[in-house]
């Protein structure tokens, strides 16, 4: 996938394959690899901006409760509308900056605004126990 990042769009299936490899790699580092659930469509033909989904998936592993991550990642595609929902367990502390969203999501929002103006929605929900990011993109050309 790295060699394709100069492209404006790559097949969604290749992006999903890249995410599958990333998730598998992260699972190798975990005490309980079964604490990760990842669902996705098979054999899609849509195109998507390269590596646009990766920051959300990375955040699941970066900010999860290391003792009990409970990571769930779901990608759904209906016609040209893609929905990614990623959630993970967190350990909430008084000085936690998890409500801020972070630089990664801020940069992702800017990139989405350039690539999918008026065709995307990125939301973050934080509770005492979990962090959930939802991304919706209309992939129509």
Label the predicted regions.
Residues 140-141:
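C-terminal end segment of the histidine kinase catalytic
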């Amino acid at each position: 996938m790295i060699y394709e990042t100069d492209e404006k769009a790559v097949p969604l299936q290749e992006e999903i394959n890249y995410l599958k490899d990333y998730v598998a790699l992260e699972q190798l580092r975990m005490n309980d690899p079964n604490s990760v659930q990842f669902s996705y469509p098979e054999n899609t033909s849509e195109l998507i901006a390269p590596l646009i989904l990766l920051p959300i998936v990375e955040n699941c592993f970066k900010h999860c409760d290391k003792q009990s991550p409970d990571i769930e990642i779901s990608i759904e595609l209906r016609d040209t509308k893609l929905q990614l929902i990623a959630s993970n367990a967190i350990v909430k502390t008084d000085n936690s900056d998890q409500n801020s969203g972070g630089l990664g999501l801020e940069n992702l929002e800017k990139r989405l605004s350039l690539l999918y103006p008026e065709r995307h929605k990125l939301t973050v929900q934080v509770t005492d126990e979990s962090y959930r990011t939802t991304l919706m993109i209309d992939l129509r050309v």
